[in-house]
């Protein structure tokens, strides 16, 4: 994890995906646009675009559930995490950008 990741409170996306997969009841949220999501996303991720982030309540009803949020580079996920926390969610993590994910993407 680099200095900027620490500065912007981001967790390494590869570690976070492992944590997501190992945690029952956790959610992985992709806040990119629909076309970006369809072009390639992490298996198990739910697409809730940043401009529709308020719809997260349709997917994550438990405000204490672990929620991992990513985008393309980490900027939109940072914005989304702030917005989700403002909605009352307690356990939300910015995991940065899918551009740093080393695993295979679902297309």
Predicted regions and their residues:
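Rhodanese-like catalytic fold shared by cysteine-dependent sulfurtransferases
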Residues: 2-19, 23-26, 34-66, 75-107
């Amino acid at each position: 994890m680099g200095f900027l990741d620490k500065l912007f409170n981001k967790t390494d996306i590869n570690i976070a995906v492992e944590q997501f997969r190992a945690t029952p009841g956790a959610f992985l949220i992709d806040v990119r646009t629909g076309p970006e999501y369809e072009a390639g996303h992490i298996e198990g991720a739910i697409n809730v675009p940043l401009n529709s982030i308020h719809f997260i309540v349709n997917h994550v009803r438990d405000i204490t559930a672990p929620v991992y949020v990513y985008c393309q580079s980490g900027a939109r996920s940072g914005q989304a995490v702030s917005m989700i926390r403002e909605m009352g969610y307690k356990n939300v993590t910015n995991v940065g950008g899918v551009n740093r994910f080393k695993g295979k993407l679902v297309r």
